[in-house]
Regions:
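Basic, polyanion-interacting recognition surfaces, primarily
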Residues: 1-124
Length: 124
C-alpha cells in the first residue's frame, strides 16, 4: 500500500482578473481591487485608481469562494471589500456599519447578519 502524504493541500486563491476589452485582455491584480459590487446581477471591480471594471462569468457567491478570505470579506449581499483599503468604519443603523474605503466616495454598509463577523475579520 502507498502511504498518503501528510502535507495539507493549501487552497490557491484568485490572484488576478482577466478583463476582455475587444481583442485586448487587461489584467487586474486582486491586490489592486478595493471592492467588488453587484448591481442588477452585473459584477464590477473597483480598483485603487478609482476605475471600475466589469467582471464576467461568475456569480457573487462563486467569486467570494475564489478570493482569499484573509483579504476579502463580503459585507452584504452585493459587496465584497479588500481589507487593505478599509480606512475606517462607524455605526450606521441598528446593527450595521458604514465602511469607508480608500478610492471610494461613499461608504459600504454591512448587513446586520455580517456586521459581527466583519468586526472579527478586521481584528485578525
Amino acid at each position: 500500500k502507498k502511504k498518503k502524504p501528510n502535507a495539507v493541500a493549501t487552497k490557491r486563491y484568485k490572484s488576478r482578473f482577466f478583463l476582455k476589452k475587444g481583442q485586448v485582455v487587461d489584467i487586474l491584480k486582486t491586490e489592486d481591487v478595493v471592492c467588488i459590487r453587484a448591481t442588477s446581477g452585473v459584477l464590477s471591480a473597483y480598483d485603487n485608481h478609482g476605475k471600475h471594471h466589469l467582471l464576467t462569468g461568475n456569480s457573487m457567491t462563486e467569486l467570494e469562494a475564489q478570493l482569499d478570505p484573509s483579504r476579502f470579506f463580503r459585507v452584504n449581499r452585493s459587496e465584497i471589500v479588500n481589507i487593505n483599503y478599509v480606512l475606517s468604519f462607524e455605526s450606521y443603523a441598528k446593527e450595521t456599519l458604514a465602511v469607508n474605503l480608500q478610492h471610494m466616495s461613499e461608504p459600504l454598509i454591512t448587513s446586520k447578519t455580517r456586521t459581527s463577523d466583519f468586526r472579527k475579520w478586521l481584528a485578525t
